[in-house]
Regions:
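Acyl-donor-binding surface of acyltransferase catalytic domains
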Residues: 1-74, 80-81, 89-92
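Conserved catalytic-core motifs of GNAT/GCN5-like acyltransferases
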Residues: 25, 41-42, 201-217
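A conserved beta-strand-loop-helix scaffold within acyl/acetyltransferase catalytic domains
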Residues: 81-153
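Short His-Asn-centered micro-motif
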Residues: 147-149, 182-185
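Conserved acetyl-CoA-binding loop-helix of GNAT-fold acetyltransferases
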Residues: 148-151, 157-170
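Conserved GNAT acetyl-CoA-binding A-motif
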Residues: 172-184
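Conserved active-site alpha-helix within GNAT-family acetyltransferase domains
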Residues: 186-207
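Charge-rich, low-complexity intrinsically disordered segments
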Residues: 214-240
Length: 240
């Protein structure tokens, strides 16, 4: 049985590339015991000095909703009753991330015409850490790393990500965070397109992991190359 995370990944594949993308993924999964290759694009962007909403002629998205910034287990406990158990990372996992210094942004929208809130999605960020394909390392750059994002299926495509992004950017400005970064699978076309166009990220490198004969032989992109790509991006954006 597929895990919730795999089901979500298949849904993203279908949205971005249709049935051929799903079939390609399935073939690779069948061949994975012999040869398995994973890749993640490394994406990053510099935080603008001011919100796009401050620009002349730019109005706030009309989607009705709110985004809460959660930095402690106590803050999570206050709203956990509205979070469904079906999300990819359950409450216990979210608490562990908070204990590690992560920040979680929760998106809600009004329930029908009443005043109750209903859960839309969440994203997990962490400062000064970079993680890709099972490896993780602290970095000396002033970056906010996006660990994971999930929007419930019934709310996708309704611009709730705009509410989340605005809240996240305001948090970064208040806390002196200069850069955002994350990773996206190359075959996740819908997320990649959104990141590069709507969110104005740049692809600054690609991390690869190749496993042969059930992990007997493994090659991974060296950390030095990943750090160099991040450092070059920071240097160029700082000069600019």
């Amino acid at each position: 049985m597929l895990s919730p995370r795999k089901r979500q990944h298949i849904w993203y594949l279908y949205r971005g590339g249709g049935l051929p993308a799903v079939i390609t993924w399935a073939i690779r999964a069948l061949l994975s015991p012999l040869y398995h290759r994973e890749a993640r694009h490394i994406v990053a962007r510099k935080m603008p000095e001011r919100s796009p909403l401050d620009s002349i002629g730019r109005e706030k998205e009309s989607t009705d909703g709110e985004c809460l910034t959660v930095e402690s287990s106590e803050a999570l406990r206050a709203v956990e009753g509205a979070i469904p158990s079906s999300i990819t990372y359950p409450l216990e996992s979210l608490r562990k991330y908070l204990a590690q210094g992560c920040v979680i942004f929760l998106v809600f929208c009004p329930k029908g015409t009443g005043q109750e809130r209903t859960f839309v999605g969440y994203v997990i960020y962490q400062r000064g850490v970079f993680s890709v394909l099972g490896r993780e390392k602290a970095l000396p750059f002033n970056m906010f790393f996006g660990r994971y994002r999930q929007t419930l299926p019934e709310y996708r495509g309704q611009r709730y990500s705009s509410i989340l992004n605005i809240t996240r950017d305001e948090y970064c400005r208040r806390n002196g965070i200069q850069f955002l970064c994350g990773t996206i699978a190359p075959d996740n076309r819908s997320s990649l397109k959104s990141a590069l166009t709507r969110d104005e990220y740049k692809i600054i490198g690609t991390a690869v992991r190749v496993s042969i004969l059930r992990g007997r032989f493994v090659w991974e992109t060296p950390w030095e190359r990943i750090e160099a790509a991040l450092q070059d991006f920071v240097r160029q954006e700082t000069r600019g």
